[in-house]
Amino acid sequence: QFARRVFNKFVMAIEEGFDENQPFFEQYRKMWWNIWHFLQENPTVLSNMNQYKSLLEFIETCKEMEHSCWDQFCLNGQAANVLANLEPRILFLLSLDTAIVLASDNKFLGIAVTDVVLESVIERSWRAIQK
């Protein structure tokens, strides 16, 4: 289905160039920028994601992220005592979701942000998920 394709493209974008041998912050920063750039290059994905969030099938598809790069990152970070002991879904809301929210504000509300501001958001959202 189309919803699954949208979701899979999104997950693939997060994982692009990901290197689990990098320090945890650098891994996080890479995923954050991957999301930001993907949504800037594919702005219709934001509209699609907003439409699909209420569909049961999309919710089930999101649950399939359990073996994703993000989930593994969370498990590894928790095992290393770096990340808070919260579900990966909650950690995502506190961190990488900021890229989606800002991209959405940019597209739908015309609110532009500089790279300096985005780097600050990355650092602050990283602190939000640290132990």
Question: What is each PLM-predicted segment?
Answer:
Residues 1-30, 47:
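Amphipathic alpha-helical linker/stalk segments
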Residues 5-11, 30, 34-41, 55-80, ...:
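Amphipathic alpha-helical packing segments from all-alpha helical-bundle domains
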Residues 13, 17, 38, 128:
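Short alpha-helical functional segments enriched in proximate histidine and acidic residues
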Residues 16, 20-22, 78-85, 131:
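Surface-exposed helix-capping loop/turn segments at secondary-structure junctions
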Residues 19-23, 40, 54, 82, ...:
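Residues in soluble alpha-helical coiled-coils and helical-bundle/repeat scaffolds
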Residues 22-40, 44, 89, 93, ...:
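Amphipathic alpha-helical segments that line or abut small-molecule/effector binding pockets
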Residues 47-51, 78-124:
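Hydrophobic/aromatic-rich alpha-helical bundle segments in the mid-to-C-terminal region
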Residues 73, 124-131:
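C-terminal alpha-helix
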